[in-house]
Amino acid sequence: MPDISPVAEFDFVIVGAGSAGCLLANRLSANPDHRVLLIEAGGRDNWFWIKVPVGYLYTIANPRTDWCFTTEPDPGLAGRSIIYARGRVIGGCSSINAMIHMRGQASDYTLWAQATGDERWLWGGPDRPGETLAIYKQLEHYFGGADDWHGSGGEIRVERPRVRWKILDAWQAAAAQVGIAPIDEFNRGDNAGSAYFHVNQRRGRRWSMADAFLHPVAHRPNLTVYTHAQALQVLMDDQVHDHQRRGAWTTAQRRATGVRLLKDGQIVDVRARREVVLSAGAIGSPHLMQVSG
């Protein structure tokens, strides 16, 4: 095993430069007093096929940009396993996916509010409790301008598809005949129906969450980005002091103090004075928690 290099120290250590990680790096580094480290196992997102919309045919199942996970064989698939794409590149899945911009159902956020006991998670809207819709609008730059459902001036570009297909129009007409009604869009809190998806593009090119949140602030002197750095373990401290017991830590017996990672053939420990944030994806984050005890 390689030797452990001298420890680097930051205020916040973010594991995973996907959609959530890019946004968190943007917001946390907005305070110049915060030293922020963003860790990404993959490389930069400057490959031609990432930017071209059809390029997801070349980025998915490609180890340059994808973890290349596959599912277990399933009887419902005649024993086949299928590709389970997870981005391994700056921008994460937003750099390799089909660019579909689709919010959840309003009822999904009701479940979140019930689970947390916090009404701010409710969908919201005029004269209704909840902040989710308002936050979506704040983040968005919608091609049609601001309205009851969409915002303008935010970082996330939302456009309509640049082409229509006769076969899709025929499918929509057939769906209507069996009771699946055509709707204007999928982002108003009720996704039942058929419509063309909105897409995260700008002038016909992919607009990833790295384009939206990371690249515009990459010049900040208090923001450091490690690429080709594989997080191996969250470092823990068994001694949790009273002044550290806030929020989710109230009943914690152990505190995350840093991350051990593999970079350039060396094991590197990075320390977090304030918080370690796991944004390594639906597979990566649970895996890190498991190997960290």
Indicate residue ranges for each PLM-predicted region.
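Glycine-rich loop(s) and the adjacent beta-strand/alpha-helix scaffold that form part
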Residues: 33-35, 43-47, 132-135, 234-237, ...
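Short, solvent-exposed loop/turn and secondary-structure capping segments
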Residues: 26, 47-52, 99, 145-147, ...
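Active-site-proximal beta-strand/loop segments in catalytic clefts of secreted hydrolases
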Residues: 17, 39-42, 98-99, 161, ...
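N-terminal glycine-rich phosphate/pyrophosphate-binding loop and immediately adjacent elements
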Residues: 1-137
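Conserved redox-cofactor binding core of oxidoreductases
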Residues: 116-256
